[in-house]
Structures are given as structure tokens and as C-alpha cells.
Amino acid sequence: MCIRDSHLPLSLIHTNESVSGITVVDIVNGRITALQAKAIIIADGGFEGAFSHGQVGLGLDLALRAGVPLRDMEFIAHSPLGIKDTNLILPLGLLHDGATLHEASGSDLEFGESTLDEVCQMVSNAKQPVIDARNLGDASGWWNAVFRTVKQRTGIDMSRQTVGIESRPHATIGGITVDEHGRAILSTWSRWFTGLYAAGDASCSGFHGADIL
């Protein structure tokens, strides 16, 4: 089932570890409604918005209050390319295509073969770190859409200017434990919450381990 944008989920309706519907509130008129459903897929993302703006884990809260355990909630993936004073995070592919990192003074931040966590730490320790994507060469055309978004949101033209960055959480690893079919698992792999499924960042299959692959 799919909930309309004008509705917020309140709680799962369930009996004996089997889902039968969901209660929602209409944010336009304030009316609370119960919707019947044979199956519900929670796919609203993780809880990375708890650190800035974005997903806040409403789906995870629904599952937890229904008695579904959450797994690996301590594992959080960070990105070194969050644009300061926005909720924008630049793709790491920019670094592979030739973008460079610097302090505002002009000093280079040499990341070489560093791991992503090491680059995040480097950015966190730097004084006013910036990313320079002005010299991407033939790859620049692939980033036009990203540059347009940044300019619309910040007024900065990345093809001509550097932009301030910061390390920040961008994805959560943990979530609703699921099996290979996406079913929400209870205390053992042989027991699942009938009719409840999870996908994407709301789920935790164990595939990533402690960080995003």
C-alpha cells in the first residue's frame, strides 16, 4: 500500500504478529483514519535526518512500537562532502573525476588512497574545508545537473567557485531486520511479522556490515 503525501502514519494495526492495516492522520483536515491492508512495505529511509534535515525514521518507529526489533542501529555512514548550511551532499564521484579538497587558505587536503572514514576525519579536522570542482575536464558535462542544483540552492556556481563542505551523516546502516524476501524478522530467522516488509535504508539485511559498501 502507498500512503498519500497528505497523510502521516501513526501506528500499525496488528494482531498476533500479523499486520492488518495502519492508522494515519490527514495533515490537511486533522482526521485520523484506519486503512486496511494485507501487506505494508516500510521504505521511507533511515534516520539520518536526526542529525540534520531529511529522513527521521517514522517507519522504524512504527515497526518498533509494533514489537519488531531493530538491528545495527549504531552503524552510521558519513560523507565528507556535505555542503555547509544546507542539507545537500555531493556525490563522491566528483573526487574520482578530479575534484580536489582544500582548506580555505589554499592548502591541499591530500586523501590519496585514504578510506572514506579517513577522508571524513580529514575534512572534520580541516580549517574551513572546500571542494574545488572547477577543473574536471571532459567529465564536467556529467555533473551539470549537480552544479545546477547547488547554484539554485546556494547561489554558488561550482564550475567557477569552490564550495564549503563538512563531514556529516548521510545514511544509516541499521533498521528493520529482513530476510531475503524483505520480510520483517522477529527474534529468529524462522519467525517473521506476517504482512510487514521493509526495503531500502529502512531495512537491515546485514549486506553492508558496519558501513556502506
Residue ranges, per PLM feature:
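A conserved FAD-binding loop/helix module that cradles the flavin
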Residues: G49-A66, F193, S205-L213
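AMP-binding/adenylate-forming core of the ANL superfamily
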Residues: I40-I42, L196-Y197
